[in-house]
Swiss-Prot record:
Chain positions recorded as L-glutamine binding sites: G352, L380, G381, M382, Q383, E403, R471
Protein name according to UniProt: CTP synthase
Similarity comment: family membership: Belongs to the CTP synthase family.
HAMAP family documented for this protein: PyrG
Subunit structure: Homotetramer.
Gene that this sequence comes from: pyrG
Assigned EC number: 6.3.4.2
Organism the protein comes from: Buchnera aphidicola subsp. Acyrthosiphon pisum (strain Tuc7)
Residues that hold ATP according to the record: S15, L16, G17, K18, G19, I20, D72, K239, D240, V241
Length: 545
């Protein structure tokens, strides 16, 4: 099977949307019956993003096999119907770590280890390993051309054209074409300079995708083509749109997929983008608008909750409801500032770490429970819901998590006992930690649902498999008293009897789960828990108008 590689780089500035562009192109090529995978190369020194602050990096997307990866892999999964693995994302730190381990073992037989060839060879090996079962491999290189961090990756993809043949490689460069409002002009000079930087590395781009506030007109595309040495048909205008789900059609309308298929000499059927037409239609046509509050601590960067926000939108599509998402800093609720919660039709508390903002989250849950507002807790959102119920309903004021208070008298939430490095009650002290990275309960785990529960009804099956990312769990030894007071456990893991789902029966909609359902939601199908949460929030709005 011939393998064709499409390398996507970015220029001028960061955050241009290379991930969305790669996912959208992948969706079009997948619709042409091509076997696609997408790889993200990240040029930072961290081994993976698992220990990076969400405020700096955005969410950590967890794959089925438990890899902690870049949020772009979430876009890849949602757009191309393909599950990602640990092979689909690697970093400079991961590559260097691998090479250094080999050097310590003596695998290099005394050679002097250098960026070229050892680091670049390791990068190429990882790309080839991930492409084993695909015939079209899209590779997104993080960062911006010109950054020193990206150089080993750029050199590796330059070499790949030599190794496998230039005819099997396409270089796509995504650049910014700014619109200067005061002059009423689009400026192409930044793109020209960015391409020159790429040429200095030895890479001639085959296709330019020009991100701009407005459509780049033909005469400007001709100018870019002339000075950047690419055909006019290969200069693609990517104007700003109000929905990422419009991008596949935008690229298809400019025949980007035709250009690629002709380049690779692929005889494949035309792409049918009907499913994307349906998504766009659902996004525009709704009967109701509701307000959902995400109560979190990382709201300075909305990308910290990217998959949660997308899953809420997907659920809105399925219910013909427009979801207005409000990101609320949990610390703003700490002084019982319930005014900011009054207009919400649903409250969601997502995953997180640490004790900052916990009081505000507890108060938000209490407000949702007492005022019969639909509540959805995810990961930490489930753990805090249990603590709130234990303190305010059962009357166990000492109930807490050892994450927030290692010496608490009633540790209803405690470290997972059978995980590596989790033996110390003083785990939060730096000196007692061995490794933070890669030591949580990660990836897909089976869960058994209770008969006659809401979750069983929504999933319509007894055994489900969902993705996890947590270091703390419910303490089963202390939970019986809480369960007896009315907080039902309706889902437990099959392996270790871990509490996975809780429900409150005397409430319109109060459900929380230890796993992360947002990672498996798609714009076409949504996710059953999110869909019913939004449905309940819609009912709440009607009841309180």
């Amino acid at each position: 099977m011939t393998k064709n590689y499409i390398f996507i780089t970015g220029g001028v500035v960061s955050s241009l949307g290379k991930g969305i562009a790669a996912a959208s192109l992948g969706a079009i090529l997948k619709a042409r019956n091509l076997n696609i995978t997408i790889i993200k190369l990240d040029p930072y020194i961290n081994v993976d993003p698992g220990t990076i602050s969400p405020i700096q990096h955005g969410e950590v997307f967890v794959t089925e096999d438990g890899a902690e990866t870049d949020l772009d892999l979430g876009h890849y999964e949602r757009f191309i119907h393909t599950k990602m693995t640990f092979l689909n994302n690697f970093t400079t730190g991961g590559v260097y770590s691998q090479v250094l381990k080999k050097e310590r073992r003596g695998d290099y037989l005394g050679a002097t280890i250098q960026v070229i060839p050892h680091i670049t060879n390791a990068i190429k090996e990882r790309i080839i390993l991930c492409s084993k079962n695909s015939n079209i491999i899209l590779v997104e290189i993080g960062g911006t051309v010109g950054d020193i961090e990206s150089l080993p990756f750029l050199e590796a993809i330059r070499q790949m054209a030599v190794d496998i043949g230039r005819k099997n490689v396409i270089y796509i460069h995504l650049t910014l074409v700014p619109y200067i409002a005061t002059a009423g002009e689009i400026k192409t000079k930044p793109t020209q300079h960015s391409v020159k930087q790429l040429l200095s590395i030895g890479i001639q781009p085959d296709i330019l995708i020009c991100r701009s506030e407005k459509t780049v007109p033909l005469h400007e595309r001709k100018k870019i083509a002339l000075f950047c040495n690419v055909p006019v048909d290969a200069v693609i205008s990517l104007k700003d749109v109000n929905s990422i789900y419009k991008i596949p059609k935008l690229l298809k309308n400019q025949k980007l997929d035709d250009y690629i298929c002709n380049y690779f000499k692929l005889n494949v059927p035309e792409a049918d983008l009907q499913e994307w037409e349906e998504v766009i239609y659902a996004e525009k046509n709704f009967n109701n608008t509701i307000v959902i509050g995400i109560i979190g601590k990382y709201i300075k960067l909305p990308d910290a909750y990217k998959s949660v926000m997308e899953a809420l939108k997907h659920a809105g599509f399925k219910n013909k409801i427009k979801v207005d998402i409000q990101l609320i800093n949990s610390q703003e609720v700490e002084n019982k500032n319930f005014q900011i919660l009054k207009n919400l039709n649903g409250i969601l508390i997502p995953g997180g770490f640490g004790d900052r903002g916990i009081v505000g989250k507890l108060l938000s849950i209490q407000y949702a429970r007492e005022n019969h507002i639909p509540y959805f807790g995810i990961c930490l959102g489930m753990q805090i819901a249990i603590i709130e119920f234990a303190q305010n309903v059962v009357g166990i004021k000492e109930a807490n998590s050892t994450e927030f208070d290692p010496q608490c008298k009633y540790p209803i939430i405690d470290l997972i006992k059978n995980r590596p490095n989790n033996s110390s009650k003083n785990y939060n002290k730096i000196e007692n930690r061995i490794n933070l990275g890669g030591t949580m309960r990660l990836g897909s785990q089976p869960c058994k649902l209770s008969a006659n529960s809401l979750s069983r009804k929504l999933y319509n099956q007894e055994i489900i498999i969902e993705r996890h990312r947590h270091r703390y769990e419910v303490n089963n030894l202390l939970f019986k008293k809480i369960e007896a007071a009315g907080l039902q456990v309706t889902g437990r893991s099959q392996k270790n009897n871990v509490v996975e789902i809780i429900e409150l029966s005397n409430h319109p909609w109060f459900l929380a789960c230890q796993f992360h359902p947002e990672f498996t939601s798609t714009p076409r199908d949504g996710h059953p828990l999110f869909i019913d949460f939004i449905k309940s929030a819609g009912k709440h709005k009607k009841n309180f108008i």
